[in-house]
Regions:
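C-terminal binding/interaction regions
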Residues: 2-32, 80-144
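Small-residue (primarily alanine) positions within well-ordered alpha-helices
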Residues: 23, 41-42, 71, 75
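Short beta-strand scaffold segments in enzyme catalytic cores
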Residues: 36-45
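Histidine- and/or cysteine-centered catalytic micro-motif in compact active-site loops
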Residues: 44-46, 55-56
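Hydrophobic "anchor" residues
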Residues: 49-50, 124
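Short beta->alpha transition motifs characteristic of CBS
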Residues: 52-56, 130
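Compact, glycine-rich, soluble single-domain proteins
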Residues: 55-70
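Short, solvent-exposed cationic patches
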Residues: 66-87
Length: 144
């Protein structure tokens, strides 16, 4: 019997074996000499295209870039505007969660995106972004 999830039918269809395979394959490009934690992400767009990203660390830690934002920035720089789900994977950590910065950036571009966590055994956990970041920061325009 299948476990219930927080996903709707449409994003479930988007979570293909192809997406899972590409995300697992991409992790080898991760550059993590400091934390030793390899992370990869796959962003599935409404166009059907998949964009992958990996974490890229820097000795000046604040300049490190997470896999989620790299995947998103690649997609946006190629003209993508609608995003269905983001798959996140780390072989070292069981169900790695996105950081707050990534959730904030993702919420601006895709306020209804589904975040999918995958472990080494291809087990999945599904979270609407709003369950992970209920109240994202927004600038409120003020009239002078």
């Amino acid at each position: 019997m299948a476990k219930p999830s927080l996903m709707t039918a449409s994003p479930k269809k988007a979570l293909s074996k192809e997406l899972m395979k590409r995300v697992k394959s991409a992790v080898r490009f991760s550059y993590a000499p400091y934390s030793k934690i390899l992370v990869s992400a796959g962003l599935y767009c409404a166009s059907g295209k998949i964009y992958t990203g990996v974490n890229i660390e820097n000795s000046s830690y604040s300049l490190t870039m997470c896999a989620e934002r790299i995947a998103l920035f690649k997609a946006v720089s190629e003209g993508e505007k609608k995003f269905r789900l983001l798959l996140l994977y780390s072989p070292q950590l069981n169900f790695i969660m996105p950081c707050g910065a990534c959730l904030q950036v993702l919420s601006e571009f895709a306020p209804d995106i589904i975040i999918v966590l995958m472990n080494e055994n291809d087990e999945l956990k599904f979270y609407p972004i709003k369950t992970l970041l209920a109240k994202p920061f927004t600038l409120v325009s003020s009239k002078s």
